C-alpha cells in the first residue's frame, strides 16, 4: 500500500488571508507572498477573478510552507482562541455553505507529525508518542476507507440515529414531539474533506507546534502501523481522561459494539471494575477517587499530555460544577433551544460502562424530555462542554419542588472510549512499551504494518 494523502479542513470564513512562504504554483503560474481570497456570489474572488475552486501546490515539496491567518482553535471549548498557523503541503480553497473552506492536502505521515505535537506536548515520552502515532494513524485510515458523510448520512436516519448538525431535520422535530432527543456527533459532518483540524476529529495545527526529534522518531519507528481487529483497521478513539474506567463505543455513538473498545478498569487490576451502569455503583465510583493510571496530579506527567491551554484545566479526574436555578434554566434554553421553564430535576436514565450518562431526563415546569447521547448532554449543560457526562446530581434548597441550586460532581474529561491520554502518559513513565499501552486500551487488537 502506498502512503495516502489526507485532506484537512482548517478554516471556514467569508474571507481567508494567507501567506505563501515558498513558491507555489496554480493554473501553471508561480505565486508566493501575501494572498487574500473572498467569498462572492457563490464563488471565490482572487486577484480580480472568480473561481469555483483554487489549488495552490508547492513547487518544491521538501521546502514548502504557507501560513493561514486567524485560525480558530478549540471551537466551542473553554480554550477557544485565534492564532496564525503554518502548514506544509498543498492548500485547497472551496466554497461551502456561503463561506470559504481552507483545506490542507498533505501526506499522512506528515499530518501525523503535526497531530502528535498538537494533541500532546512534544516533550512526552517516546513510548507514549509511539502509541499515539499508531492510534492517530488507525483512526485516520479507518475513516479514509469510508466515503464522505453525504453518502453515509442516508443510513443514519432512524429514530435512534440522528446525524450531526441536523437541527432543522424533520426527524429531530418528530423526536422532540416524542419527548426524546438522542443525537451523537461524528466526523460525518464533513462533506468535502476527510477530517477537520480541531477536537471534533484530531487536533491539527500544521507546523505551528514545533515537532521535536522525539516526535519524528515516534512517527518513523511506527511508520504505517495500525491497530487491527478481525481484519479491519480499528476505529481507535481516544480522550483526555477516562476517569478510571473505559467507556464502550455504542454508548457514545452508533449502536454498534466494537469488541476492542470494551469496558475495563484503567489500572493494573484491569478486571476489577464495578458495574457502573447501575446508579448506586456509579454514584459510589464518582464520589470517590479510585486508583487508576489516569488518577495523577504529577505535573511532569500532565505536561506531557496537556498543552498550555489544556493545563488551564486543573481538575479532570474528579470535578465539580454548580448552577443556580436561574442560571441553569437560561443555559439549557440557550444551548438546546427548548424552554423547559424552571428546572425541577435532572434524572439519570441510562449510564454506560464508565458511569457516563447516555440518557438524561430533564424535568422542567413547562416540559420534560430525555436527551442523549453523552456529547449532547455535555453541550446542553455547559456554556461550552462539561468535562464528561459521568456525573451525579445533587439538588440544594428545594422549595415547593424547585431547587435553588444544582451541583454536578463528575469524573473524567472526554468520552472515555479507547486510549486515555493521561493514563497512557503514566504508563509510559512507569516503563510500559507502546505496544503494551495500546493493547491495554484496545482489548484483543493487533498491531499490523500497512506500508
Each language-model region and where it sits:
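Conserved, single-site charged/polar hotspot
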Residues: 1-451
Amino acid at each position: 500500500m502506498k502512503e495516502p494523502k489526507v485532506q484537512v479542513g482548517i478554516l471556514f470564513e467569508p474571507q481567508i488571508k494567507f501567506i505563501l512562504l515558498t513558491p507555489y504554483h496554480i493554473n501553471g503560474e508561480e505565486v508566493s507572498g501575501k494572498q487574500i481570497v473572498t467569498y462572492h456570489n457563490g464563488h471565490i474572488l482572487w486577484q480580480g477573478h472568480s473561481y469555483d475552486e483554487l489549488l495552490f501546490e508547492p513547487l518544491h515539496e521538501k521546502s514548502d510552507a504557507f501560513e493561514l491567518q486567524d485560525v480558530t482553535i478549540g471551537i466551542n471549548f473553554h480554550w477557544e482562541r485565534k492564532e496564525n498557523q503554518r502548514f506544509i503541503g498543498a492548500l485547497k480553497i472551496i466554497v461551502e455553505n456561503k463561506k470559504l473552506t481552507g483545506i490542507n492536502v498533505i501526506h499522512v505521515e506528515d499530518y501525523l507529525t503535526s497531530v502528535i505535537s498538537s494533541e500532546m506536548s512534544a516533550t512526552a515520552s517516546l513510548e507514549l508518542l509511539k502509541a499515539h502515532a499508531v492510534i492517530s494513524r488507525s483512526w485516520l485510515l479507518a475513516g479514509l476507507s469510508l466515503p464522505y458523510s453525504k453518502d453515509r448520512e442516508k443510513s443514519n436516519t432512524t429514530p435512534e440515529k440522528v446525524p450531526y448538525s441536523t437541527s432543522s431535520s424533520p426527524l429531530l422535530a418528530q423526536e422532540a414531539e416524542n419527548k426524546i432527543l438522542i443525537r451523537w456527533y461524528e466526523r460525518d459532518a464533513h462533506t468535502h474533506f476527510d477530517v477537520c483540524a480541531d477536537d471534533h476529529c484530531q487536533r491539527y495545527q500544521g507546523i505551528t507546534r514545533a515537532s521535536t526529534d522525539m516526535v519524528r522518531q515516534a512517527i518513523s519507528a511506527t511508520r504505517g502501523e495500525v491497530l487491527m481487529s478481525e481484519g479491519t483497521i480499528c476505529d481507535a478513539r481516544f480522550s483526555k481522561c477516562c476517569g478510571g474506567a473505559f467507556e464502550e463505543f455504542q454508548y457514545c455513538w452508533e449502536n454498534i459494539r466494537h469488541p476492542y473498545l470494551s469496558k475495563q478498569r484503567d489500572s493494573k487490576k484491569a478486571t476489577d471494575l464495578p458495574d457502573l451502569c447501575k446508579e448506586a455503583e456509579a454514584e459510589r465510583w464518582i464520589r470517590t477517587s479510585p486508583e487508576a493510571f489516569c488518577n495523577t496530579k504529577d505535573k511532569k506527567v500532565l505536561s506531557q499530555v496537556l498543552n498550555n491551554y489544556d493545563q488551564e484545566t486543573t481538575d479532570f479526574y474528579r470535578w465539580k460544577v454548580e448552577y443556580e436555578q436561574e442560571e441553569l434554566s437560561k443555559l439549557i434554553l440557550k444551548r438546546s433551544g427548548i424552554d423547559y421553564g424552571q428546572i425541577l430535576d435532572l434524572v439519570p436514565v441510562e449510564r454506560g460502562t464508565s458511569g457516563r450518562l447516555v440518557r438524561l431526563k430533564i424535568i422542567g415546569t413547562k416540559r420534560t424530555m430525555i436527551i442523549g447521547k453523552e456529547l449532547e448532554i455535555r453541550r446542553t449543560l455547559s456554556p461550552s462542554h462539561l468535562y464528561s457526562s459521568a456525573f451525579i446530581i445533587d439538588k440544594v434548597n428545594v422549595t415547593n419542588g424547585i431547587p435553588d441550586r444544582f451541583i454536578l460532581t463528575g469524573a473524567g474529561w472526554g468520552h472515555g472510549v479507547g486510549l486515555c491520554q493521561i493514563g497512557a502518559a503514566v504508563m509510559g513513565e512507569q516503563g510500559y512499551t507502546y505496544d503494551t499501552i495500546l493493547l491495554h486500551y484496545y482489548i484483543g487488537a493487533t498491531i499490523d504494518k500497512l506500508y
